[in-house]
Each structure stands twice: as structure tokens, then as C-alpha cells.
Amino acid sequence: MALWILVFIAGCIADPGLHVAQSRNILRGDQERKSLEDETNKLEYRITNTWDSIQVIHEPVTITFKAGDGGLIMEVNSLYFDDPPAPPGEPGLPFDGLWDYEVVEAFFLNSKTKEYLEVELCPHGQHLVLLLSGGDCFAKGLDLDFKADIHWNKWNGTALIPWRYFPPGVDKMNAYAIHGSGIGRTYEALYPIPREEIEEDQGPNFHCLEYFKNFSLKWIMGENWEQPASDLWP
């Protein structure tokens, strides 16, 4: 079975076929990868910077998106930092405030309406799903089929995000990873804020929507796919 690996520089993936002929020349420093096997597509992202555009010095967190039964599969492969300790919640259930623990997050945005979905996944099995409009959360704690496993110093997790959770017309995304405690708390971003745009005393803010970059569910599902209607969005 033929397997084609097409690699894209982060932020330049607006046209899935744009860099086919040039793919051999842009393997270094890529944050996004699109793999095609017959008609099954997947997108792979690597978080290589902190929120303020400093390169991470550990193995990057990898997030993979692919088609699932009734939704989008989100796979996480990451180092396990074991800091902070596990949240005091039951694995497999939503946990409010999960962003204060070790977590990997993905945001899916409609840049015109400013409506977006936030999905947070924890190595200990807890999760948190939030629906937001203009930065205001109007629904959270939605159910999610999510399983996570820790193997020594690494963890992996798989979640199935139902289509009804996505706002109509998703065209941008970003992803984040957080770990550590106190002054060692580390905030990493797929698409960080450029160093020259950071203001004095500015801290991490994952809701800076202007730094999200192009994303389409059709890159995974196919150009003829239509997003199912949702009862959760106006």
C-alpha cells in the first residue's frame, strides 16, 4: 500500500497540495505533517516552542488528528513530566480547572464568528471540553470518550471529539501543552506569540485568537465532506 508523506511548514498549510513538489526541501523545522494513505488522511502537529517563541529543549509534544466514527480523533504523544501531581478527579470524567495541571490542549476556531471549541487532555485520564464565543465560555464539562496511558516517562492519549462539539465553519486552530509547578510552570504553543510582539510583563494567554493559523476539517475528511449540524451552537 503506497504511503505518501507530505510535510508542511507551520502556517503554510492553507493549501494541502501547496508543497508537494517541494516537500524534500522543507523537512527541517516543520511543525505540521500531512500523511495520506489511500483516502485516509491525518494531520500531525509538533509543539516546538513556548508561548513566547522560545524553542523547547525536550522532545516535542505530538498531536495527531484523524477521522473517527462520528467525530475527530485526537491523539497525544508526549513526555510525562509528572508535575504537578494528578488532579483529584476520577479518570475518564471532566475536571474543571484542568488547565492548572499537566495538560495538552487543542482549540478549533471560526475566525469570523469568534466561536471556538477547546479540548483539554490530561495524562491521568481527566479531560475538559469547553465551548466559547468571543472568549466567553457558555458550556463546559461535556462528555468525552478519552483514554490515557503512562509508560515510564511518556504518555499517550486518544480522544474522540464528536462533530456536534465543533462550531460551524472551523478555519483556524492552535494547540498548547502545559506542565511544571511554581516558577517552573511551562506553557508551550504550536503557534506562539512572536517575540517582537510581546509586551512588558505579558504572560501566557491561550485565547489570543489572532495567532491561530489556518486549519480545515476537510484536510482530514476530504473536500466533499460536509460538517454535520450541531444543536450546541446557535
Residue ranges of each PLM-predicted region?
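Classical eukaryotic N-terminal signal peptides for Sec-dependent ER targeting/secretion
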Residues: 1-6
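Extracellular/luminal beta-rich ligand-recognition
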Residues: 93-145, 150
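Acidic/polar low-complexity flexible segments
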Residues: 30-37, 95-104, 109-116, 168-234
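N-terminal intrinsically disordered, cationic/polar leader segments
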Residues: 58-61, 68, 151
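Short amphipathic, basic-aromatic surface patches that mediate peripheral association
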Residues: 78-96
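Short, well-ordered beta-strand segments enriched in hydrophobic/aromatic residues
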Residues: 65, 70-84, 155-162
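N-terminal signal peptide
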Residues: 9-29
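Extended, acidic-biased charged interface segments
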Residues: 144-182
